[in-house]
Amino acid sequence: MDNRIAYKVKKTNCKTGTKNLLKEMFREEKDQAKYDNGVRDLHPEMTQHNVWLEKPNIETFDKERDERIKEINKKRAERTSEEYTAYDRRKLRSDTVDMLSQVVQPSSEWINNHTREEAVALLTEAYNMMKEHPELYGEVKAAVIHLDESSPHLQVLSSALDMENLRSKAKELVGNKTAMSEKQTIFANGLKERGFDVERGVNRLSHNYKARKEYLENKYQTPITRHNEQKY
């Protein structure tokens, strides 16, 4: 059985509002036309069953983000000790990444072999794990399980700001391709330790994967991507 679980993350800088993203998280049955792009396969009759694990205030969310940035800038300016340089005292960049948008999604085969209740249990535990480890996933500020699409998934918004050290830790939380690949392994292993039968997705950075990809592309004279690799 294909029991892979996907973990994806995108960065959002402090100049970008999250209201539209939050509206999507808060979507209702009547909103289908706004979010159904022909690919997502929305089931609006199921929207009422979406599960909120951490529900934010959509009207104050971005204001609270701004306040955290202002608090950091104020405290940085107040650094008077000689150990701090002018760089340490200056404001955060205007395009500082302060939020992470994260999605957790089991494979279609895993979903087809488990009940909706089991899917909710898995995704709820994924949320709990992320909540317990802000050093890996940021400080969770919003989380919802979408059951109104063809494949149930968890959507999480978390803060990437380090309020103690007065900086953004987005680079450490996301990292480069290699670090992200390692994090996907850590994520899947964390859920396995909690009793769930899941594996990380395909490791496209591994030597074995690259060698097999090259072999298949030469054999079939076609590019192998994550969208078609299961056919070969």
Q: Language model features by range: what are they?
A:
Residues 1-232:
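N-terminal nicking endonuclease/strand-transfer module with a His-rich metal-binding environment
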